[in-house]
Design a protein with these regions (language model features):
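Non-catalytic substrate/cofactor recognition surfaces at enzyme active-site rims
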Residues: 1-175
């Protein structure tokens, strides 16, 4: 892990977020490229809503830098984001006005990559992956969601629920 003290902001109160960048390295025993799973608490939206580009945002530039420096393939996972946690954009208003947010997005990705590349506290783990799964029911109280289920847009099993405002609940799961 690495602490990233200077790259995030939370635009909603309360301002609470994790500054920890976590890296899991999968090292194949056949000599193929390592695969890094990076987990960091930030939405991938540094291009902002005013842009017209289709982009992978800063994770694209992070992945490129890591590929060049370590020849590792990267999967980025958005970490624990309870509010509106995004990356800090220096001179954001100027960059928006000058349509230069892409420059900032590249720099953000490269800087986060440098943090990932600096991680030196690796711990070897046994190659076992476990997961926990729990099913639960959610009241279908959203009329748009209920309609989408009723006409087949969303494939979901409905379960009768006398206490639900729509008369049914949906089964979902947390993994």
């Amino acid at each position: 892990t690495a602490e990233v003290p200077d790259m995030q902001e939370d635009i909603r109160t309360p301002v609470v977020y994790s500054k920890t960048l976590t890296r899991f390295r999968f090292v194949p025993d056949n000599g193929e490229n390592e695969i890094w799973l990076l987990n960091f608490a930030s939405h991938s939206e540094s291009l902002q809503g005013c842009n017209h580009l289709v982009s992978a945002d800063f994770p694209c530039y992070m992945r490129r830098r890591i590929k060049e420096a370590a020849n590792a393939d990267v999967v980025y996972g958005v970490g624990a984001i309870g509010g509106m946690i995004s990356m800090k954009i220096e001179d954001e208003d100027v960059l928006k006005k000058e349509h230069r947010l892409l420059e900032s997005t590249e720099k953000i990705g490269e800087k986060l990559a440098d943090y990932a590349l600096s991680i030196s506290n690796d711990e070897k783990l046994s190659p076992v992956i476990n997961f926990i799964r729990s099913e639960f029911f959610v009241e279908a109280d959203n009329p748009v969601l209920a309609l989408a289920c009723n006409i087949g847009i969303i494939s979901a099993d409905k379960y009768g629920d006398r206490d639900s405002s729509k008369g049914f609940s949906l089964k979902t799961e947390l993994t």
